[in-house]
């Protein structure tokens, strides 16, 4: 079991502890629960889905990397597939606050990058900030997404984001988590291919500046992240953050990164290269390459 879960596990009820401990045994537990694992936990505890998600929030919050604030926020995104995806906030020392990943963004991008096609609900241990409410409005589940907070009744996103501005106001039809393929030819070694594939499935309807990042670890594991734009622009999630989020959720640390590749267009309206390099160097990675899409 990864050390991050040890303290959180002791806060859970005894029956839940006993049921989930075997699932956490792998130090690289992927921070997600398959539908059958959720059913197993429900059977062991007698909890319904909503109550179980609340009970598991300490484990999601344990996935956070708030290296600046030391304020752990945890989220659990529930996919239409039945899978549950953990998420936690991330802050990067030596970079800028603009590179931060919020817990809701973490759980949602986790689900998206794992191939989930839509979300039913998200459970969070603190009220979503305005940034996250806007980020969630980019999803294909839209304002109907159910938000569950401790001590409150569940409400749809529209309750937390009245008079919402979103992609439909800009006549965008393809939404975040819809299937997308930008059709760039995939070639090169495994890491290069992963970066191009990530760019191919990115969500960039506003700038038309597709990009993807792939990270290779010292043990050969590869994590990739896709760019996710937002109608309000600022809540956009860069591709590097998607990849770093998966890396961290899977129990790895930044020093494990040995090589990184960014795939983007040379003539794109928005360029990720400088911000990607600056953040990776702040995390100790200097072996960074750029592959041009075309």
From Swiss-Prot:
Catalysis: reaction(s): cytidine + H2O + H(+) = uridine + NH4(+); 2'-deoxycytidine + H2O + H(+) = 2'-deoxyuridine + NH4(+)
Cofactor field: Zn(2+)
One MF annotation (Gene Ontology) recorded for this entry: cytidine deaminase activity
GO cellular component: cytosol
TM regions (residue ranges): none
Active-site residues annotated for this sequence: 104
A GO BP annotation: cytidine deamination
Protein name: Cytidine deaminase
Organism: Klebsiella pneumoniae subsp. pneumoniae (strain ATCC 700721 / MGH 78578)
């Amino acid at each position: 079991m990864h050390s991050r879960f040890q303290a959180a596990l002791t806060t859970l009820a005894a029956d839940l502890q006993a049921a989930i401990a075997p699932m956490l045994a792998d130090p690289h537990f992927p921070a997600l629960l398959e539908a059958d694992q959720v059913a197993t936990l429900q059977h062991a505890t007698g909890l319904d889905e909503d109550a179980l998600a609340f009970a598991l929030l300490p484990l999601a919050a344990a996935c956070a990397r708030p290296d600046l604030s030391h304020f752990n926020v945890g989220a659990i995104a529930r996919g239409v597939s039945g899978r549950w995806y953990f998420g936690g906030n991330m802050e990067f020392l030596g970079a800028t606050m603009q590179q931060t990943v919020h817990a809701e963004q973490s759980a949602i991008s986790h689900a998206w990058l794992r191939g989930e096609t839509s979300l039913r609900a998200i459970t969070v241990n603190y009220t979503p900030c305005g940034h996250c409410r806007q980020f969630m409005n980019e999803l294909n589940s839209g304002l109907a997404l159910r938000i569950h907070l401790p001590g409150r009744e569940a409400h749809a996103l529209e309750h937390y984001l009245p008079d919402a501005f979103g992609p439909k106001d800009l006549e965008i039809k393809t939404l975040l988590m819809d299937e997308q393929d930008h059709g760039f030819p995939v070639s090169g070694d495994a890491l290069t291919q992963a970066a191009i594939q990530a760019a191919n499935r990115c969500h960039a309807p506003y700038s038309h500046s597709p990009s993807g990042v792939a990270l290779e670890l010292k043990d050969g594991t590869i994590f990739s992240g896709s760019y996710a734009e937002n109608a309000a622009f600022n809540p956009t999630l860069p591709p590097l953050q998607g990849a770093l989020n998966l890396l961290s959720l899977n129990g790895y640390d930044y020093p494990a990164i040995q090589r990184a590749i960014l795939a983007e267009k040379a003539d794109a309206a928005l360029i990720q290269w400088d911000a990607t390099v600056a953040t990776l160097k702040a995390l100790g990675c200097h072996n960074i390459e750029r592959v041009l899409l075309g």
